[in-house]
Amino acid sequence: MIARHRDLVGLYICGGGMEGVIAAAREEARARLAIVCNELTAKSRAGLIDGVLTAVIHTPTALMAERALEAMNQAIEAGSKATATQIVVPFDLFLPTNI
């Protein structure tokens, strides 16, 4: 896709296949292509360091689980008076400059 679409300036990888996109971007070595993906892994960290990736949006899963458990405990304690709860967990944004 990267090779076929020369007018492509940005790519967001929101699901699987990040490793393949990183490998393809390394082969193409296009300076103008901004690539953003989800979750900081060894491969995405290397992509940031190498300059292949522009940014990584990372979900703090431990914090998300902690907040979900807190909400469940509150719902159990509230019993029939429990109401819907919205939990906001901030994301981490990693760039080549802060990795």
Could you tell me what each predicted segment is?
Residues 1-42:
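Hydrophobic alpha-helical
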Residues 63-99:
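Hinge/cleft segment of the Venus flytrap/periplasmic-binding protein
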Residues 38-42, 59-64:
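Short, acidic/turn-prone active-site loops that include or flank metal/cofactor-
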Residues 50-62:
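Short beta-strand elements at the ligand-binding edges of bilobed clamshell
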Residues 46-47:
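Well-formed, non-transmembrane alpha-helical positions, independent of function
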Residues 1, 29, 53-55, 74-75:
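Short, hinge-like loop/turn segments at secondary-structure boundaries
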